[in-house]
């Protein structure tokens, strides 16, 4: 009887540990995708050339909107 109780407790603990590991792995995958999301599409020719840091802090305007959407790394939004 004791052996059965010990085995059941061990099975429950093992299942909870596996669920915890699955949650950790899911969180690490989410973190990795967030890091990849921030990049400059036009780094070599527009961000830093045509777009200036002043465009990053403006509230409105075509250039400000473009800078916030496409030059996130240049503007320091990452």
UniProtKB/Swiss-Prot annotation:
Tissue: Expressed in ganglion neurons residing in the mesoglea (observed in both planulae and primary polyps). Not expressed in nematocytes.
Entry's Gene Ontology BP terms: neuropeptide signaling pathway
Entry keyword set: Cleavage on pair of basic residues, Disulfide bond, Neuropeptide, Signal
Protein's UniProt keywords contain Iron-sulfur: no
Superkingdom of origin organism: Eukaryota
Keyword hit for Transmembrane helix: no
Domain spans labelled ShKT: 38-78
Residue stretch(es) of the prosequence: 20-36
Covalent S-S links between cysteines: 38-78, 47-71, 56-75
Signal sequence segment: 1-19
Function, as annotated: Probable neuropeptide.
Protein name: Protein Class8-like
Species of provenance: Nematostella vectensis (Starlet sea anemone)
